[in-house]
Amino acid sequence: MEDKERIAQAADILRRGGLLAIPTETVYGLGANGLDENAVLHIFEAKGRPQDNPLILHIPDASWLTRYCEDVPETAYRLAERFWPGPLTMILKKKPCVPLRTTGGLETVGMRCPDHAVTRAIIEKAGVPVAAPSANTSGRPSCTTAEHVREDMWGKIDGIVDGGPCEVGVESTIIDLTVTPPQLLRPGGLPLESLIDALGEVTVEDRKSTRLNSSHRSLSRMPSSA
C-alpha cells in the first residue's frame, strides 16, 4: 500500500472516532481525535488507564498551537523552533475546545509534535489534534515496534500504522510553560541540559524542587508543596 493511501485510511479512522496505533520517535502511541470525548474515553478503556490521567495532544507543527491553546508564550515557539519535531511536550493553557476529559480535568494541556513524517502527515490529513498515550496496556512496557503493539492491543483498537522501530525508545520530556521559571515534569527523550541551555533556568520537581540555571553551578532549594 502506498503511503498516500495508508495516510488517508489512517486519517479516516481518526476522524470517525476510532483508535489507531501510530509510530513516533519515542514509543508507539494509541491515537484518537483529542477533541472527541467518546474517542478519548475509548483510549482509557483500551489501556485500562484511570480517566484522571491527562493525555498529550500531537500536532503536525507549531502553527497549530493557537488552535487549542491560549496565551501561548514566546518561549513555546522558541522551544518548538529548536526541538520540534522531537521528544518534547509543552504544557500550555488549553482553549475551551479541548475537552476536560482529554486533560484529566485540568485547564492545561500537553502539546507535542512527533518526529515521524508519516504520523505528522496523518494528523495533518485528519485535521484534528491526536491524543496519544503510549500504545500499551497500563502497567506493561511501552511498545517500540508495531509487532509489540499487535501482541498487546490487538482486538482493542481499529488499526496499526507500522512505521518501523522507534528511534528514541523512551517517552517525551515534559516541561510546564504555565509557570515561571518553566518546570520539568517528566524527564524523557530530550535531555534536561538541552532545556537549560535553551531557557536559561528550569525548575525540576522531586520531593524538593531544585532550580537549575544555565551556569550549572547555582542550585537553590525551594519548599515542596503539600
Listing of model-derived features with the role each one plays in the protein:
Residues M1-R211, R217-S218, S224:
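Active-site-adjacent structural elements in enzyme catalytic cores
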